[in-house]
């Protein structure tokens, strides 16, 4: 039996499988700068944005925090399954959160342009931009059900309310295109 066979499976899509995410991982890296606990959805937004942008300047924005959060989650999962903590660095080689890549609308690896998706909803604007060759490097949506649908379609948890400082601080500050839902005004 290989190390890969003994590692606990960590599936983000299973974690959010219910009607509303009511989960929280507490670890040394799940604290905000002010000492409050970072909500699970924000932890998953950081991790999923990092994994989809790894190896790019956009991924660098999330790298340090994402790797620390992934280590917390991995240690919690492996300890609860086996009674002892496993080595995160070895586990990382076996693609934690592999299900983020098993989605219908994967991002382009070599995009023609980048964009952010504010007021993301379930991702209609993102789909149009991806069809034109773009790659989303930041998304935000405050509605929990829309976040879940977005995750299942794109493998990425959008950040939450963009009026909150912690969400603003996650933004890469590189804007190519943004949309706003105009249905209410039409």
Regions found by a protein language model. Give the residues of each.
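Conserved active-site and SAM-binding loop architecture
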Residues: 1-186
